[in-house]
Amino acid sequence: MRDSKDALDDKSGSFTSLLPPFGKQRGTSPNDAIPIKSPLERLANSVTSPEKPTVRTAIQKDSPRRKQIDDDQTPPKHLKRSFQNVTVVSPRKKKTIDVVELPFTKGGYGGFYDPRPGCLKFTTHEINVSYTDTSIPVIHIPVQLLKRCCWLQGWRDNLVESPVHAIHLTLKNRDMKRITIGDSASLLFLYNPLHVESARAGLDLLDQSDFSLTSPSSAKEFKQLLTLKQSTIIPRTPQKTVRSIVKQTSSPHSSKMPKHSLPSSPTPFNSNSGDSLLSRIKNSNQSSSERPTANNGAQEQNQSSSSAGNTSNDFSTLCSQGSDKTLLSDASCTTILVYPFSGTNSIAITNTDLTRLNEGEFLNDTIVDFYLRYLYCKLQTQNPSLANDTHIFNTFFYNRLTSKDKDGKRLGHRGVRKWTQKVDLFHKKYIIVPINETFHWYLAIICNIDRLMPVDTKLEEQDEIVMSSVEQPSASKTRQAELTSNSPAILIFDSLANLHKGALNYLREYLLEEAFERKNVHLKSTDIRGFHAKVPQQSNFSDCGIYALHFVELFLETPEQVIANTLDKSLRRTDAKNFDQQWNLQKINTMRCDLKGLIRRLSTEWSSNNERQSLSSGSNDEEDKENDDDLAILPITN
């Protein structure tokens, strides 16, 4: 074994390498370092020298007091602790996810697709794009340079069927040249649908204060997001422009592909529906080929100048400008239903909204708002008293409540102050709030807040009312007391069993400010408790909206029973066996078809109602004309 000084003189050694593996020794200079010893040698209390014997300083168990040390016998400068007495303390820290990796199969920037795979690394402040080819430099995209992020999770309707999963980034025009190679402000990354949870976690990790996170609302927007377009102004001669672009770049637009192919993805999709779609495309092409346009000329130029390249590119037809016209020629957005048929705040449903009810599709806000409005109108006829005690916000309420202003501050109550000018929330027993966060629907139901208002009429005449003066349980008793069906609470119904502490805090703060502004009552945050209900869990990633609507429908049928089963522990234990029957899971499986049938039935009624109104208005116009014929123009006399 070498001495510590000899070890320090060695060029390969360092002072930090001499430290024991269980912690640093005392002393800051190399001269104070203690040589490393084996675990057996560490059992000794100290290092002895031949000149001076070692003096034990430990207290013996049998002796009542510590032994005295002679003046001529001094202990060594550093006493080693025994190996068995040294403990390593490593406190457990809560690990937070700092980086989320999402592998992509194809990418696109600069106006064209790039078939090379890679990986997206999401952090709070930026997105890093790294390819498997290490020669390609890593692209760093700060969040401040993002203008919009759109999450695509497939699309299927009568004319377009594509299970493409992708993330489309739109950069700010003034900063796009700092990121991409070329003049395109769009970046597109296609990934495997099996990695949808990684995409969800990555988008949730980003700081979304500087950009908007959206999803396509129509098949046309879905296809446009999959088409990387250059931002330069095209001259009047588009054929020459396309010819120069094809010569200078290796674009997948110029690869040899079938003339008419369906949009595809890294995973196969159902090919049975492709025959009818293919026949429609061919028929539309025959009718549109007679009209020469700039887009058709560009398409012919791309096909004629095709060279040997990646022949397995499945997105060339989807990205071409000609296919945009053929695929969506018959998919025009038309209104099929306006509900209610008359009155204010009616909801218009188009044919593209109806495709959101297909299997595997996410419900949009139009479908959710429509069914919530339908349930409330149905409740007004069947149970008027319960309808009077219930208020349902639309899907935009929570989004407005949590949005931020130009200065980056959350709007909160001031953003939705005018929403309740004609509604007294504290006279309502149940308040339903649909919430959509990161493309996931869940439900918040506020119960029994009418019990928070003071009952004594004399207290209402005071300028300020503090809830501590009302006969309410103290804060300590409220925390210990169990929730009952009559307790003021905010219930969260989530089919993915996620915790939503932020949503509970936002809604609780809103109620506190609403009570102070409308009723001049000071409420405490402990007066309104939050609870995550145990509800059935979805088996896929697209039925969250279906489950949320089912929870609302089931709640409006028997609200007190649902609250009791959710809050009372005794009822939760007894109803555990009848959980599936309690939530009527069989109806969830057929709810998409039921909603389609409901919309089609109401659509026929709405169209027939419009025809009757048009006929009645036409007859009234004819009567007015007949009455006008009897009128005579009198001359003006002085």
Curated annotation (Swiss-Prot):
Biased composition regions of type Acidic residues, renumbered to the chain: 620-631
GO biological processes: protein desumoylation; proteolysis; regulation of cytoplasmic translation
Any single Pfam family the record assigns to this protein: Peptidase_C48
InterPro entries registered for this protein in UniProt: Papain-like_cys_pep_sf, Peptidase_C48_C, Sentrin-specific_protease
- Biased-composition ranges for Low complexity? 250-264
Biased composition (Basic and acidic residues) is annotated at 1-12
User: Polar residues: which segments have biased composition?
Assistant: 238-249, 267-314, 610-619
Per the record, residues carrying Phosphothreonine are T526
Where found in the cell?
Nucleus
Write out the ranges of the annotated region (Disordered). 1-79, 238-314, 610-638
The UniProt similarity line reads: Belongs to the peptidase C48 family.
Protein name, as recorded: Ubiquitin-like-specific protease 2
Organism expressing this protein natively: Schizosaccharomyces pombe (strain 972 / ATCC 24843)
